[in-house]
């Protein structure tokens, strides 16, 4: 499993429009066979900033399969016009740690 964190800054004053657009666009993520889960969070200190956390089955499931799909083009068309700048997107792996105590 791969965790993707996308930091998104939307155009100031467009937060409600972005959240409404994401409510529509999330179906494209949910329908992807490579998507395991996702969550949209909004920054308290900077209300125009969001972090979108995804869990994908593999990195290629995200970067090749989802981003290369027609569904991604629809997703992008709904959300990207509301971005103040391109999102910062990074991928992570879980780190296995021994149990505490």
Model-derived regions, located:
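Glycine-rich beta-strand-turn "strand-cap" elements at beta-sheet edges
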Residues: 2, 39-51, 76-101
């Amino acid at each position: 499993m791969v965790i993707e964190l996308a930091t998104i800054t939307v155009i100031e004053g467009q937060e409600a429009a972005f959240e409404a657009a994401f409510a529509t666009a999330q179906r494209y993520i949910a329908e992807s066979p490579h998507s395991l889960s996702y969550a949209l969070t909004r920054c308290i200190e900077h209300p125009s900033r969001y972090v979108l956390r995804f869990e994908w089955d593999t990195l290629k499931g995200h970067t090749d399969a989802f981003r290369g799909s027609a569904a991604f083009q629809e997703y992008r068309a709904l959300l990207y016009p509301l971005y103040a700048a391109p999102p910062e997107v990074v991928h992570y792996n879980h780190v296995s740690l021994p149990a505490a105590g």
